[in-house]
Amino acid sequence: MRRPKLPRPRLPRTRAGQRRLVQALMAGCVLGLLPATWMYLVTGDRLRTTADVPRTDVAVVFGAGLWAGEPSPYLAHRLDAAAELYREGRVRVVLVTGDNSRKDYDEPDAMRTYLTRHGVPGSRIVSDYAGFDTWDSCVRAKKIFGVDEAVLISQGFHIRRAVALCQEAGVTSYGVGVDAKHDATWYYGGAREIFAAGKAALDAVFEPDPRFLGPRETGVANALAAER
């Protein structure tokens, strides 16, 4: 059985049609670059290293997946940076935010366990079990945990989006982008950010509620007060 031939797309033949096509392509490129431009403008000089980030009460570590119940290598790098900042006295409390939507998947508890193994007291760690994406984590840090200022910790390809969204959510933020091996996961993460930037811009404009908001929690305030 012969397959029917599908018509091939044809380029405009007239000069006016070609001009409109070029204009449409240029407009698409400009619109595609707007979210990334917005992120760069918002973050400005707010990206630092573990050595020069300002002293801040709270560090926020975003989840990045578990392997057999343990933090993935990328998440472990983030947690190592948080532990380093705590040991050096640059942060006082670590807020770990991640996915706990299933009984068999608990990012925050795995992050807590890793941090305690690396010298951060459990009393200095606060868990957010509903950080399902970056925007949710930022909004919940502000509205649920009362965080007004924070150091955000993530990989370099994600940190600008995290800082931009937390700034929009009302959390004055500095970002520490940890080093990562340029493997397939790194390249995937970088490519994913191209599309995630568009969603981030929409989140910043429309400010949707997180998937789960819930009542106010005093974990961060209690941890800071107990230290004094």
Regions flagged by a language model, labelled:
Residues 102-107, 174, 196-203, 219-225:
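A general structural signal for short secondary-structure boundary/capping elements
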Residues 13-22, 183, 187, 191-194:
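Structural motif marking the loop-to-transmembrane transition
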Residues 190-212:
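A transmembrane-helix-recognition feature enriched in membrane-embedded lipid enzymes
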Residues 4-50:
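N-terminal type II signal-anchor transmembrane helix
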Residues 208-228:
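Short linear elements at protein peripheries
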Residues 2, 7, 39-191:
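A structural signal for short, hydrophobic/glycine-enriched beta-strand patches
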